């Protein structure tokens, strides 16, 4: 049985509206999965007329890129949730409501193996000089 190190790479980091957030991942090690936890509070009337009312609907792209150009994983927010569901048969934890001034929360697991703590399959970070996580959102101050 392998020893799994659980590490929080960033906590309490804010994303700017309609921007891409980038995070450089460790240079070595074995990565079986990433779990992104996102939360926000909507504005008073932002979601009352919105077609997109879940937090995940405002994530237009989640990418894991190796050496600046090799795409390892690339999803929009809904595809990331669907991929986890197809792999595990479970829906990721979320909390969203369709009324004003409500906190929205979303867990987005990204698997590099067959499941979260897969000991056989995953991403060997030492194969790349640099691995970057990029999260692009399309939210505006009107909604959040």
Regions found by a protein language model. Name each.
Residues 1-144:
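Short, low-complexity Pro/Thr/Gly
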């Amino acid at each position: 049985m392998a020893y799994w190190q659980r590490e929080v790479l960033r906590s309490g980091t804010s994303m700017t509206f309609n921007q891409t957030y980038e995070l450089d991942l460790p240079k070595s090690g074995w990565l079986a999965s990433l779990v992104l936890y996102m939360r926000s509070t909507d504005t008073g009337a932002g979601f009352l007329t919105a077609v997109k009312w879940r937090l995940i609907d405002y994530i237009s792209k989640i990418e894991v890129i190796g050496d600046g150009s090799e795409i390892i994983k690339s999803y929009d927010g809904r595809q990331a949730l669907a991929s986890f569901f197809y792999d595990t048969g479970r829906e990721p934890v979320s909390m969203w409501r369709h009324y004003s001034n409500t906190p929205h929360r979303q867990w987005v697991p990204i698997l590099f193996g067959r499941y979260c703590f897969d000991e056989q399959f995953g991403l060997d970070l030492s194969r790349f000089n640099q691995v970057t996580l990029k999260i692009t959102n399309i939210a505006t101050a009107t909604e959040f």
